Amino acid sequence: MDTGLANSKESLRDAWDEMILVLEEARNAIDQPNMMPPPANDRNLAEGYRYLMGFMHAAVERAFHCDPARPQFRNALSVMTRGTIDNADAVYFYTPIDGREQYLIRGCAEDTSHWQGRATANGVRKAPHYVIFEASSGCLAGDSGDLSELRPGMKTQTGRLDSSLIEVNPDGSFDILLAPERPTDYKGNFICTLKTVTRAHPTDPAMEPERYATYVSGRQLFNDWEYEEAIHFEITQIGNAGTHAPAYSPQQAADDIRHFGEIVRNQMVFWNAFWTIPMGTYGERQGTIPGIGFKRNVFNQINAASGATGGGMSTNLYAGGIFELNTDEALIIENRIQLQPHYVGFQLGNLWGESMEYANQIGSLNGHQMSVDPDGVIRLVIAHSDPGVPNWLDTSGHPEGFMSPRWAYSTTPDPEQWPSISATKVPFKDIRSHLPESTAFVTQEQRSEQIRIRQRHVQRRFRAF
């Protein structure tokens, strides 16, 4: 056999064998206590394997089909790759880039009147309620497999642009230039891919202060699921259109195989540790921080997105909590808003951080879907069965799970203008006595219609062709 061919076979088999071992480490994160998984029960174990497969699905694209010279936007999270308490209202997108180069993003949206604060016509197709692009230096959240990535300075946002500032042509089209600096004669939409920092990198003090973006990511947030349509984005590295990558080689394949396994393992390890240690989701365990933990049926303090929140959309305010309910109990949430955000949403997640079913069941609600009471308070009801009230959130049978409210502001308001949120546990049979008398009754037919709209929207949002 040709020596070169024999070496290729051996190196590829070695890479494959290493990848299988690394995937076994990822699998161990489902049920080995030292890997800090959620408490074991039949459903948590079953969903843990599905959760792992979601990371494997995403890692195929990320390891084998990402090229900063010829980028393509891909789903970072979706109905098949749920995690990190993903927002049921969002398309998460990302692509790797080289921030030293220039890129052009193109899109074409339906009616964008609401981006400029104008009313849209009833019954017409619309752009997503809110869109944001963010260019960042560093790894995607969780890729290091180590909580040290949360330290200030490990990641740097170099620029961002949201739909309140995107200039759109009359036909709905728009372009966005990404570059280390804005060309002097350029007046259009722009995102900077370079930021010079003044503090040394926490793990590499010798690193130069220039931080070039390594990826661009973002969200499309949907409010009116019946009429808002996802936007297809194209991205091109300027000066590189019409080129192709070098022929795929055994060395590249071996590198990609290893990278695939590392992505999966590191994501499993990181998020288990994140929920267990800084968040204290499961109470005090070995290695947790004394006094830090999610109390049940209450919310922690609202925070702006940061490393402490595991990243997140940079314009968001977040709160968090864990519901814990018996079948004869419910949780009534009261959300008071002073300064109207661009977006408000409330999502439920299982203890792996997967969003609860939001197409075939109502595991989330947003500002368009929520009913607001006459006193201006948004009251939501978390319960295991339908209480026949407008703002019901379905636990999908989980006795406990994450509660994740979100409020998005283009400019973060002063803390005294932030919303407030609280929770009260009540007997299921007494729900209506804790709600205003004006609270409507929702019939089974009306609930089915709500779910029909959700099912159709989710199919459109994540269509593959």
What are the residue ranges of the model-derived segments?
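A compositional/structural signature for long, glycine/proline-rich flexible linkers
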Residues: 1-465
